[in-house]
């Protein structure tokens, strides 16, 4: 199977799969991919994410000098939440589109489970490894945007912990950070426990008992 290119000037996506009709958008840049990638209008991007109109994304970096692709990254749509979209400053009054507000996609704010490299450092990854990571990432698919945000934020906290075995208290240490990200929720610790249970049910952590957990192999 292969993906096909949409006709020009389509506002949402660049490619589609003729078998399953899934859509993909490509963002590319010369040089290192970096932590963020420029996108279009901020309000449009937020509307797409919250309205479940976002395609899956490919991010590509290339070397114009060496005429080669250096990195090619796949990020499924269900890893997109408003928190990873960074609002840029409005264009100056002297600009042709004065006041227009663009955005950046903060790919460094996406959990590692959602950043799937097809090419890394100029080397193509094994297809079996890519398929395994995509299938595993699909377990994190959550339609409700608020529930998705909580699950991915707690997953990022777990990812930040050193080692494979950790305690509930270790995750509670992120209570302040999670409270800032979700100010409408005043019961952060119960929410943390709920997300850990979901991550266990989805196969990303094991519960060892007595408030202890273990990260599962990727």
Regions found by a protein language model. Name each.
Residues 20-39, 44-54:
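Short metal-binding segments enriched for Cys and/or His
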Residues 190-218:
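Charged low-complexity interaction tracts in eukaryotic proteins
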Residues 2-8, 27-31, 208:
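Short Cys/His-rich "knuckle" micro-motifs
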Residues 176-192:
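Short, positively charged loop/turn segments that connect secondary-structure elements
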Residues 10-24:
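Cysteine-rich micro-motifs
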Residues 145-165, 197:
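Positively charged, polyanion-binding regions of nucleic-acid-associated proteins
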Residues 170-174:
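A short acidic, leucine-rich amphipathic alpha-helix
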Residues 70-153:
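Long, low-complexity, charged/polar intrinsically disordered regions in eukaryotic proteins
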């Amino acid at each position: 199977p292969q993906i096909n290119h949409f006709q020009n000037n389509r506002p949402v996506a660049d490619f589609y799969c003729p078998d399953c009709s899934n859509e993909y958008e490509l963002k590319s840049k010369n040089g290192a991919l970096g932590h963020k990638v420029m996108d279009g209008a901020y309000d449009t991007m937020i509307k797409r994410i919250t309205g479940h109109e976002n395609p899956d994304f490919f991010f590509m970096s290339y070397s114009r000098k060496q005429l080669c692709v250096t990195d090619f990254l796949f990020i499924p749509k269900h890893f997109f939440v408003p928190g990873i979209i960074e609002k840029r400053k409005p264009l100056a009054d002297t600009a042709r589109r004065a006041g227009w507000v663009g955005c950046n996609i903060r790919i460094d704010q996406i959990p590692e489970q959602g950043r799937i490299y097809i090419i890394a450092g100029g080397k193509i990854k094994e297809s079996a490894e890519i398929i395994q990571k995509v299938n595993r990432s699909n377990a994190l698919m959550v339609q409700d945007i608020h529930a998705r945000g909580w699950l991915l934020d707690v997953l990022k906290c777990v990812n930040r912990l050193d080692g494979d075995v950790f305690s509930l208290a270790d995750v509670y240490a992120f209570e302040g950070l999670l409270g800032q990200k979700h100010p409408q929720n005043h019961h952060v610790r119960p929410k943390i426990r709920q997300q850990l249970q979901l991550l266990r049910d989805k196969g990303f952590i094991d519960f060892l008992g007595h408030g202890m957990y273990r990260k599962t192999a990727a």
